[in-house]
Amino acid sequence: MSNTASLKKEYADRIAPALKSQFQYSSTMQVPVLKKIVINQGLGMAVADKKIIEVAINEMTAITGQKAVATISRKDIANFKLRKKMPIGVMVTLRRERMYEFLEKLVRVALPRIRDFKGIESKFDGKGNYTLGIQEQIIFPEINIDSITRILGMNITFVTSAETDEEGYALLKEFGLPFKNAKKD
């Protein structure tokens, strides 16, 4: 819990004032904040094997500290042997304390464990949000490498209140995300 308090305190004490002066906001309410982190795994192979969803839910719950939910298909697709309302993925939405705990764990522990890690791409969605693709779930310390049956990747989306990509980049950079290179203007 001390990490969460320190990360929130760091945002209030250091990050928010730095962003306020960098972008010349007139009010502190204009400073972008991290609203939520959404972690998603698409598991197309779950059509053939239902146990994959259960394993993925348990792994995602262990990684995030919050119960994961299965995502279901919206329509039938015969070519993929997919029927409506079949589970085809797993997702978790983190807010408040758990969001900060996960961010801390991601930046300080998980990302440095990636093989040949040189930083993450700095491509945003145009509205200040950022999605990071992870190839292997084994970078998280909660996952026992010996007990996994298959390597699964995931998408981690950082939803911010930033209005531009530049503001979102500055916010996430201040939180400690290791981007590859400085943003080119």
Curated annotation (Swiss-Prot):
Q: Report the leader peptide range.
A: none
**UniProt-listed InterPro entries:** Ribosomal_uL5, Ribosomal_uL5_bac-type, Ribosomal_uL5_C, Ribosomal_uL5_dom_sf, Ribosomal_uL5_N
Superkingdom, taxonomy of origin: Bacteria
An example GO CC term for this entry is: cytosolic large ribosomal subunit
**Cystine pairings recorded for this chain:** none
Q: What Pfam families does its record include?
A: Ribosomal_L5, Ribosomal_L5_C
Sample GO molecular function, one term: structural constituent of ribosome
Checking SUPFAM superfamilies in the record gives:
RL5-like (SSF55282)
Q: Enumerate the Gene Ontology biological process terms.
A: translation
Q: Which UniProt keywords apply?
A: Ribonucleoprotein, Ribosomal protein, RNA-binding, rRNA-binding, tRNA-binding
| Function noted in UniProt | This is one of the proteins that bind and probably mediate the attachment of the 5S RNA into the large ribosomal subunit, where it forms part of the central protuberance. In the 70S ribosome it contacts protein S13 of the 30S subunit (bridge B1b), connecting the 2 subunits; this bridge is implicated in subunit movement. Contacts the P site tRNA; the 5S rRNA and some of its associated proteins might help stabilize positioning of ribosome-bound tRNAs.
Q: Which family does it belong to?
A: Belongs to the universal ribosomal protein uL5 family.
Q: Which HAMAP family match?
A: Ribosomal_uL5_B
What quaternary arrangement does the UniProt entry report? Answer: Part of the 50S ribosomal subunit; part of the 5S rRNA/L5/L18/L25 subcomplex. Contacts the 5S rRNA and the P site tRNA. Forms a bridge to the 30S subunit in the 70S ribosome.
Kindly provide the name given to this protein in its UniProt entry.
Answer: Large ribosomal subunit protein uL5
